[in-house]
């Protein structure tokens, strides 16, 4: 399966609690932190919920 790199580009401060929990669940902490995750529907749904806070790149 393909992998994606998720980078936190905006702060979750002042956002809804569900969005902050999603950021933590993805393993993102400080700004500009990145994680590499498998490209599956569960992860893509989480990324879609906080798409205004993160950038996503495909990893080869």
UniProtKB/Swiss-Prot annotation:
The keyword Ribonucleoprotein applies. GO terms for cellular component: cytosolic large ribosomal subunit. CDD domains: Ribosomal_L30. GO terms for biological process: translation. InterPro entries: Ribo_uL30_ferredoxin-like_sf, Ribosomal_uL30_bac-type, Ribosomal_uL30_CS, Ribosomal_uL30_ferredoxin-like. Keywords: Ribonucleoprotein, Ribosomal protein. GO terms for molecular function: structural constituent of ribosome. Part of the 50S ribosomal subunit. Belongs to the universal ribosomal protein uL30 family. This is Large ribosomal subunit protein uL30.
